[in-house]
Amino acid sequence: MFERDEHHFPVKRLLLLGALVGAGAYYLSREQNRKALDAKLAELGLKDAAQDVGSSVTKGWEKTKDAAQNAGSVIADKAQDVAGEVKSAVAGATAEIKDAGKEVADTAKDAGQNVGQNVKREAADLADQAKDKAQDVKADVSKAADQAKDKAQDVAQNVQAGAQQAAANVKDKVQDVKADASKAADQAKDKAQDVAQNVKQGAQQAASDAKDKVQDVKADASRAADQAKDKAQDVAQNVKQSAQDAKTDVDAKAKSWAFDLRTDAEAGKQGGQTGSTTNNAGTAGNTGMTGNTNTRKN
């Protein structure tokens, strides 16, 4: 009866399901597959996400393997316990029946009917105990199988959730990479526009500075020309003033010389009139001329 019930319980299917899930996780966690996946994702800049996927798959495989091992161990232990308990129950029942038979043989002479009833009652009790024990064992086996089934389902759900989470992480990583690339492109565009604007402003500022410099040079040249003109006028004025001063000095000296000559002439004339002889007068005249000459020289 126990073997038939055990065949009807889908333990093998659960083990097969666990083996399939474990095989799938193991296939995804193989070194060469991980390397190929890492190489491909490294080209896309998603190596960290791939490592997360590999880690999730590896953890799922470990959980699946542990659950399968635990389920197998529980079922094997429970089967051994059931076999031991059934064997003990049968051996106990046999021993008790044998003992009861001996007691019946010993007491048959005194109370045959009572012994028969006692033996029948004992046999019924033993049968009921064996039946109850078998039902308890069956319930324990069913409970252990249900626990193993629930454990396998939990592991499968965890593996599926881990795979979905890893896929979502990869998708989010791709979106982040695309967003970063778009942001970098926008920043580069803005930077180029800023550089162009700075260059344009620099050129305009340089042109304005050059224009201002030309205006400054023109102003300096005009100011220098005005200063040169003023300097020339000052020099001309000084020359004119010097010429006028020289002319004034010459006129003054000429007037002084004329006055001296006139004075000397008058003095000579007076000297000639007072002389006693013509020679003396001539001498005086000569002397006067000499004096006038000396005066002019002076």
From Swiss-Prot:
Signal peptide: none
Comp. bias regions, Basic and acidic residues: 174-193, 209-233
LEA-like repeats: 48-117, 128-197, 201-270
Lineage top rank: taxon: Bacteria
Organism: Deinococcus radiodurans (strain ATCC 13939 / DSM 20539 / JCM 16871 / CCUG 27074 / LMG 4051 / NBRC 15346 / NCIMB 9279 / VKM B-1422 / R1)
Molecular-function GO term, any one: protein folding chaperone
UniProt keyword list: Repeat
Name of the featured protein: Protein DR_1172
Similarity section: Belongs to the LEA type 1 family.
Region Disordered: start-end pairs: 174-298
Biased composition (Low complexity): 194-208, 275-298
